[in-house]
Amino acid sequence: MAKPSLMTASPKKALSKELMKRVKSAVRFSYAPYSKILVSAGLYCASGKIYTGVNIENSSYSLTMCAERIALFKAVSEGEKKFRLLLLYSPQLNFIMPCGACLQVLSEFAPDIIIVLMNENDELKFYPIKTLLAKPFTLVSSKS
C-alpha cells in the first residue's frame, strides 16, 4: 500500500525516474572540500525541462552556493518562469533539508513549488514549500 504524501497528482507525475537519475548523477560534480557534504538538486519546470545544480563551497564560507539556488538560477537564466518541483539529494545525509536562504529564494520564484527529499535508497519525502517556510520575507511597497 502506497504511503500518503503531501503531493498532488500533477507533481507526482513530474517525479520521474529520469529526474531521480539525473539528480543522483549530478552529485559527483559537487565541490565540497570543507564540509565534505555533497548535495545535488533537480528543478522540474512546467516546460518539462530539468535543470540540475550542485553545492559549490568556498573557503570564504558565506560565498558558498547551494545546489537548489544553482538549479534555480540556471533555469531562470535560460528563460524558465514556472516550476513544479525541486528534488534534493545528498548521499551523506538522509533526507537533507533546504536551508532558509534557498527556501526564501525559491518562494519568490515558485510560491507553490513542491520540495522533494530523496535518500540513498530512493525513498522520498514531499513538502509544499509553504510547510517549510510559512511566511517568506517580502518587500512591501510604501507610498510617500
Regions found by a protein language model. Name each.
Residues 52-56, 130:
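Short beta->alpha transition motifs characteristic of CBS
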Residues 36-45:
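Short beta-strand scaffold segments in enzyme catalytic cores
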Residues 23, 41-42, 71, 75:
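Small-residue (primarily alanine) positions within well-ordered alpha-helices
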Residues 66-87:
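Short, solvent-exposed cationic patches
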Residues 49-50, 124:
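Hydrophobic "anchor" residues
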Residues 55-70:
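Compact, glycine-rich, soluble single-domain proteins
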Residues 44-46, 55-56:
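Histidine- and/or cysteine-centered catalytic micro-motif in compact active-site loops
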Residues 2-32, 80-144:
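C-terminal binding/interaction regions
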